Design a protein with these regions (language model features):
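Membrane-interfacial amphipathic/re-entrant helices at transmembrane-helix boundaries
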Residues: 1-20, 48, 59-62, 88-94, ...
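Transmembrane helix-bundle core of multi-pass membrane transporters
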Residues: 84-160, 187-190, 211, 256, ...
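Inter-helical junctions in multi-pass inner-membrane proteins, predominant
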Residues: 1-16, 157-162, 191-229, 252-265
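Helix-loop-helix "hairpin" substructures at the membrane interface of multi-pass membrane proteins
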Residues: 132-213, 237-242
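Membrane-embedded helix boundary and interhelical linker motif in transport proteins
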Residues: 8, 30-76, 80
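Alpha-helical transmembrane segments within multi-pass membrane transporters and channels
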Residues: 57-101, 107, 242-247, 251, ...
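Hydrophobic alpha-helical transmembrane segments of polytopic membrane proteins
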Residues: 70, 224-247, 251, 270-278
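Short, non-helical or kinked segments that cap or interrupt transmembrane helices
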Residues: 15, 24-46, 87-92, 163-166, ...
Length: 287
């Protein structure tokens, strides 16, 4: 039973990692930019969720506002920070992204305080259900359901709709896609809108899971998301999804059997190092 419980716990965290890391993969696949500021959007979504939920008593409204604000923030980051420097050397957008993330962290500290905000009412934090002997909180169940629905929805969008096929074509060969009438600028906006909305929702869910939100909460998650993107193969959405779930399960087992040696985050990065020693291109990256 412990084995099954650890697998389930790992998959739950893997779903959360996937919601965060997919946005990074989408941006890298399209623009070849390591979008570090994505972690700031994650924290922004968490703050919007807790602020609106505490003010109105409605978690649903909190998530709705977080999704919209995060999506708008993502589009603004692309339009104001990335679009003017797309033709610069590759390190320039990365430096800008890191600087923007630091600015966002400090802004959260100034606006919301340095010690974080707790949810006034969070019944999901303690309420749980028992599934075949495994206790799961409502937050964990919601995390799995929302991540599956959103990621499957994105897969259907990318595979079945004209806009989704245009997005895939732009990622594969932007010049060829443009010659067939695909607007690359519109594709980039959709890319940032969807990826940022996912990050905002993930931030709200992690805030619920921890029952509080703090200015630096995006830091550790951003490092983990970057590790997942590399582990899955840079630019591979499918690789990112698989790497997220695998890393979640590895961390769950490591937190039990290696707790006296490594903490949970260290286990994840150790696993990344081992995999990259064997497959430098990542799980599904091209050699």
């Amino acid at each position: 039973m412990l084995f099954v419980e650890l697998v389930v716990q790992g998959l739950v965290y893997g779903c959360m990692y996937a919601m965060m890391a997919v946005g990074l993969t989408l941006v890298y696949g399209l623009l070849r930019i390591l979008h570090i500021a994505h972690a700031g959007v994650f924290a922004l979504g968490a703050y919007m969720t807790v602020t609106v939920a505490n003010a109105t008593g409605s978690l649903a409204l909190g998530f709705l506002v977080a999704t919209v604000v995060s999506a708008i923030a993502g589009i603004a980051i692309y339009r104001l920070a990335y679009q003017p420097i797309l033709h610069h050397a590759a390190f320039v957008p990365m430096v800008v992204s890191i600087g923007l993330f630091i600015v966002m962290q400090e802004a959260f500290r100034l606006i919301f305080g340095a010690y974080g905000i707790a949810f006034d009412k969070n019944p999901w934090y303690v309420a749980h259900v028992n599934l075949v002997g495994i206790n799961l909180t409502y937050v964990e169940i919601a995390m799995v359901i929302m991540s599956v629905v959103l990621l499957v929805g994105f897969g259907l969008f990318a595979g079945l709709t004209r806009a989704g096929i245009g997005w895939r074509a732009t990622v594969t060969d932007p010049h060829m896609a443009t010659s067939f009438g695909v607007d690359p600028v519109r594709v980039r906006y959709v890319n940032f809108l969807f990826g940022s909305a996912l990050a905002g929702i993930a931030g709200g869910l992690v805030g619920l899971l921890n029952n509080y939100v703090e200015p630096t909460m995006g830091g550790a998650v951003s490092y983990k998301a970057l590790a997942i993107v590399v582990l899955g193969g840079l630019g591979s959405v499918r690789g990112t999804l698989i790497a997220s779930l695998v890393l979640g399960v590895v961390e769950a087992f490591g937190a039990i059997y290696l707790a006296n040696i490594f903490d949970r985050d260290a286990i994840g990065f150790l696993f990344l190092i081992v995999v990259l020693m064997v497959r430098p291109q990542g799980l599904l990256g091209r050699g």
